[in-house]
Amino acid sequence: MATTVTPEPLTALSRWYLYAIHGYFCEVMFTAAWEFVVNCNWKFPGVTSVWALFIYGTCILIVERMYLCLKDRCNVLLRCIIYTLWTYFWEFGTGFLLRQFNACPWDYSEFKYNFMGLITAEYAVPWFCASFIVERLVIRNTLRLRFDEVAESGQAEERLDRGGGGRGGRRGRGARAGATSANGYVKVD
């Protein structure tokens, strides 16, 4: 009798990595859009710093913990306000630390409502919207991901050839009904 293995949730490090890449990508896209809106630059040059990987990955991982603690206690509007306040605190703290080493990649000194050039009130609405998107799309879907033991596409195809999967068969080892598998990740519905 074969033993079935239930796909495991992603580790904190795996989730951190996904959050870091998400934040990094969004930073590049935001700066490209900003450059277009402000300077009408059709090249859409998006920029960021490698520090953004650590900053966004850690920030969103902490927001994930907040989400898990707050989801049954308060509505999404209040949660997003809390996330936005946290984002300001995190941006100020990491910016202040990086500035000590002349490594802070942003400077909001030209904004009217900035504080020490590290945070600016003008970004309250974008941070709030980003918080909503992070909770509703990124965190909730990342928490649904499971890592399947069969990660190599060749192994999965071999199982299909041997009748270990495919139509009517299991999708991944121990995968639940309604789950889909691709590249070793199982998304549980």
From Swiss-Prot:
GO cellular component terms listed in the entry, alphabetical order: membrane
Signal sequence coordinates: none
Bilayer topology annotation: Multi-pass membrane protein
Cytoplasmic side: 1-17, 65-75, 136-189
Domain of life: Eukaryota
One Pfam family per UniProt: ABC_trans_CmpB
Subcellular compartments: Membrane
Start and end residues of each stretch annotated as Disordered: 158-189
Extracellular topological domain residue ranges: 39-43, 97-114
Family matches, as InterPro entries: CmpB_TMEM229
Main location: membrane
Keywords assigned: Membrane, Transmembrane, Transmembrane helix
Sequence intervals crossing the membrane: 18-38, 44-64, 76-96, 115-135
Family that this chain belongs to: Belongs to the TMEM229 family.
Name the record gives this protein: Transmembrane protein 229b
Species assigned in the record: Danio rerio (Zebrafish)
